[in-house]
């Protein structure tokens, strides 16, 4: 059985290499997928317009999936305009064009922002899972924002029980352990050392069946491998809600 990679950032045309960023084209990614036995990769979107980084917008990802539907599907994204009333219609258009989810959602607003809650409400109605990147603070790094202990995420999980939330990034996975830091710099780092029972991520997984995990990148990798015994138990317990993925190659 072929596997699915749930988190890729690709381009349609070649992108010049830089010292800090390498973006593969969808054709360049195929050997990697084949080597790992991956039948289909799901593309993350940077938004409705072309992002400052050379990663696929909704339009570009739709174009890639149309060019090679055997190997690629795509998630859509929205640009923040602060108007919740437009969200459902904009996401409906994306779904009509073939989007299978929303991601990577990285609007740098708190999770209780009305626009974001409109996204989550529409996602549940349209059956579009949401992959989010989390930041520790508005104006710091990128991603949706929550406080230490993830109280806003829990409120979203309660408020939108029919929406599937896929957690991703350092600020989410650092909460695997009960001794998760509270300062913004440390919350944006990979976790390390033995996991102390009572972490918020395991607690939220236990309480809310609509929470899922995106295991791409070192953020999730460290969360699982920092304490092998705990990580293996977590993988086994939530095997049907954890998704292996690449992020960028």
Regions found by a protein language model. Give the residues of each.
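Active-site-proximal loop/turn and secondary-structure-junction residues that shape catalytic pockets
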Residues: 10, 47-48, 80, 108, ...
């Amino acid at each position: 059985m072929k596997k699915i990679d749930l988190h890729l950032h690709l381009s349609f045309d070649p992108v010049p290499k830089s010292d800090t960023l390498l973006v593969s084209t969808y054709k360049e990614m195929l050997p990697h997928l084949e080597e790992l036995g991956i039948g289909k990769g799901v593309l993350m979107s940077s938004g409705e317009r072309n992002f400052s980084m050379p990663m696929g917008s909704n339009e570009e990802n739709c174009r890639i999936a149309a060019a090679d539907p055997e190997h690629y599907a795509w998630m859509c994204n929205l640009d923040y305009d602060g108007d919740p009333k437009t969200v459902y219609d904009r996401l409906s258009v994306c779904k009509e064009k073939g989007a299978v989810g929303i991601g990577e959602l990285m609007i740098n607003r708190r999770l209780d922002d009305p626009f974001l809650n409109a996204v989550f409400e529409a996602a549940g109605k349209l059956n579009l899972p949401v992959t989010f990147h989390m930041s520790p603070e508005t104006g710091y790094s990128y991603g949706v924002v929550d406080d230490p202990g993830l109280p806003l995420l829990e409120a979203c999980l309660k408020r939108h029980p029919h929406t599937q939330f896929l957690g991703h990034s350092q600020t989410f996975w650092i909460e695997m352990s009960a001794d998760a830091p509270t300062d913004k710099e440390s919350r944006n780092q990979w976790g390390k050392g033995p996991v102390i029972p009572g972490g918020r991520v395991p607690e939220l997984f236990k309480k809310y069946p609509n929470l899922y995990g995106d295991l791409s990148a070192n953020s999730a990798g460290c969360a699982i491998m920092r304490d092998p015994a705990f990580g293996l138990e977590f993988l086994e317990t939530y095997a049907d809600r954890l998704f292996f993925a690449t992020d960028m190659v």
